[in-house]
Amino acid sequence: MKNRTFSMFYQEYEQLLEKEILSSEIPDHIAVIMDGNRRYAGQRGRTRSFGHAMGAEVTEQVIEWCYEIGVKELTLYAFSTENFQRSEEEVDGLFNLINEKFLKLYNDKRTYEKETQIRVIGDRTKLPAFLNKSIEKIEKATETHRKFNLNVAIAYGGRQDIMQAVRDIAACVSSGKLSLEDVDENLISKHLYPAPGVSVPNVDLIVRTGGDERVSNFLPWQANGSECATYFCAPFWPEFRKIDLLRSIRVYQARKDEKKQENSYRVSKVINFLGVGKYGEKSEELGQLLPLKKQGVA
């Protein structure tokens, strides 16, 4: 009886929370650091492969939740460059699991009904041939899809991503294809993973599970440039619930509201400084001058 009551309360709370976040702005791009699979397994006396398998099940659910809520782009940190330091058995097991999930997505009619474009970001030269084959297969099959974008980071490191982009640009400058005057933020973005000219957009919200409060070298260019919101939560990845996702979006929305209030406050200060009588009717135009901090107005 107690469990049933809790379940009913949980469902009602989830519905209320979803209704609340749907009444405000939904982040276009969410990036997730899926941490805690191994600790989840360890607490239960199970193998690490069990933890990764349970985490993979949650990943499938999160993809569905994001699509249903209206998120346009989801980037998942599946395997970092540092993960190669793990045992050969664990690395091989992870690659086999990732390959299995790619093939499942390839054969799932929902991938095509929902027009999901799937791309991999990372150093593919470090991946086994069978995995690269599956990646190429699903990328080719979904390359024209535009409704929902799913990026999977494998053999990925943020610094490494920026370094390879700089090398590509330097080679283009050296060969005469580009001049130094052509190099700007937009050009660098276009040379980041997954491929030249096909960039991952700025991130609105980073979610990390497992209790650690750090972003682990994940999408530094796309995240820091947009000053994205971050949400750190205690549950291990296999324990991640829809409520946790909804709460993370609520944090993003609260941050957006705080920025709007700050901007309104700054506009009012400028109006008062310039004279309400003369400029009061121009508050809307003044608001378009923000961020005022960059213009020297505190």
UniProtKB/Swiss-Prot annotation:
Provide the cofactor note recorded for this chain's UniProt entry: Binds 2 magnesium ions per subunit.
Q: Which cofactor does it need?
A: Mg(2+)
The EC code for this enzyme is 2.5.1.89
Q: Name one GO biological process term.
A: polyprenol biosynthetic process
Q: Which domain of life is it from?
A: Archaea
Q: Does the keyword GTP-binding apply?
A: no
Q: Which organism is it from?
A: Methanosarcina acetivorans (strain ATCC 35395 / DSM 2834 / JCM 12185 / C2A)
Q: Which reaction does it catalyse?
A: geranylgeranyl diphosphate + 7 isopentenyl diphosphate = tri-trans,hepta-cis-undecaprenyl diphosphate + 7 diphosphate
Protein name, UniProt field: Tritrans,polycis-undecaprenyl-diphosphate synthase (geranylgeranyl-diphosphate specific)
Entries under Gene3D superfamilies matching the protein: Decaprenyl diphosphate synthase-like
- Binding of substrate: at which residues? 36-39, 48, 52, 80-82, 84, 86, 208, 214-216
| Native organism taxonomy | Archaea, Methanobacteriati, Methanobacteriota, Stenosarchaea group, Methanomicrobia
Role played: Catalyzes the sequential condensation of isopentenyl diphosphate (IPP) with geranylgeranyl diphosphate (GGPP) to yield (2Z,6Z,10Z,14Z,18Z,22Z,26Z,30E,34E,38E)-undecaprenyl diphosphate (tritrans,heptacis-UPP). It is probably the precursor of glycosyl carrier lipids.
NCBIfam families noted in UniProt: uppS
Q: Quaternary state and partners of this protein?
A: Homodimer.
GO MF terms, alphabetically ordered: ditrans,polycis-polyprenyl diphosphate synthase [(2E,6E)-farnesyl diphosphate specific] activity; magnesium ion binding
Q: Which Pfam families match?
A: Prenyltransf
The set of disulfide-linked cysteines is: none
Active site, renumbered:
D35, N83 (proton acceptor)
Instruction: Detail which positions bind Mg(2+).
Output: D35
Q: Which family is this protein grouped under?
A: Belongs to the UPP synthase family.
- Transferase recorded as keyword: yes
PROSITE patterns membership: UPP_SYNTHASE
Q: Matching HAMAP family, A to Z?
A: ISPT
Q: Which UniProt keywords apply?
A: Magnesium, Metal-binding, Transferase
